[in-house]
Swiss-Prot record:
Record family assignment: Belongs to the UPF0324 family.
Localization terms from the record: Cell membrane
GO cellular component: plasma membrane
UniProt-recorded name of the protein: UPF0324 membrane protein PA5383
Keyword set, alphabetical order: Cell membrane, Membrane, Transmembrane, Transmembrane helix
Stretches that traverse the bilayer: 20-37, 44-66, 71-93, 100-122, 137-159, 166-188, 233-255, 275-297, 307-324, 331-353
One Pfam family here: Cons_hypoth698
Organism the protein comes from: Pseudomonas aeruginosa (strain ATCC 15692 / DSM 22644 / CIP 104116 / JCM 14847 / LMG 12228 / 1C / PRS 101 / PAO1)
Membrane topology recorded in Swiss-Prot or TrEMBL: Multi-pass membrane protein
Principal cellular location given in the protein's record: membrane
Amino acid sequence: MHTLPVKTGTRPLAQVQKLIPGLLLSAALAGVAILLGRSQWLQHNGISALTLAIVLGILVGNTLYPRIAAGSAAGVGFSKQILLRAGIILYGLRLTFQDIAGVGLHGVLLDALMLASTFGLACLLGTRLFGLDRTTTLLIGAGSSICGAAAVMATEPVVRGRAEQVAVAVSTVVVFGTLGIFLYPALFQLDQDWGLLPRDPGTWGVYIGATVHEVAQVVAAGRSIGIEAADTAVIAKMVRVMMLAPFLILLSAWLARDKAHRRQHSGATKITIPWFAVGFVLVAGLNSLVSLPPALVSHVNDLDTFLLAMAMAGLGLGTHLSAIRRAGLKPLLLAALLFAWLVLGGGFLTRLALA
């Protein structure tokens, strides 16, 4: 009687081993990005670890990575898909529902109006004026209207964008968000004579938080005006970030209905609920209702930054510069018009809401 050897757990172990090279590469790039992100100069200019991670990923992805891609692709894919979702869920720990009270009803309405109008304008201009594909348009719109690179990354699973489409959207956020760091303090000084907005730093903080792309960029722009402006700007920005989850759910439902219309209702269309967005809200709710130890929150936020940086590095590794060049100037022009709306339209609506 012959007995066959039992290889219990061999296949799962082999699958895990396939992930290790890509995970180590993504983790190494994320670690370097986080260390570089601690530079005072980079922090002052609002350049976050997430931005640095995708830049490093693109540099390595277009030089050394093609030689090792075969052995690393599985882990890199895991980083930009699974770890991304985990990072978005943990991002909720940075927020509390009490933040909403910090900006008041008018501030919340301003955030919601800027989100809806900016995203709607992106959809209109991107596909009709510039003739961009819808996925790139939606990603640029999400990044401009909510919270920059994190919003682009969170929207990608819903719209199923390609790596180069995500990279193009993130690059527009970096360009115009960085420009905003220098523009808003200059506008604040000019407005001391013009008087278009109330001169108090708190109002300018809400204006900045409701219109600047990235959280790091909001902090940098607000601090250039003053501590009060920076604190208010961060609260207004966090309220805007909190709108990410309902935005993703509504976007998923809208895309499902749109597909059904294009297929002339030929079959049942499933609305995909982005469960990581639900997890984001649940974690924010937990943070609002339960007083968690500050040390624990700090460590989890550090872990979250690392996971998101790994996801951004993974995205960069899969991005080909030739594909970005083929996209041309149209994505940048769309982002420029959205930035103009955020600055001008946002200032007008801030005056109406808070004056």
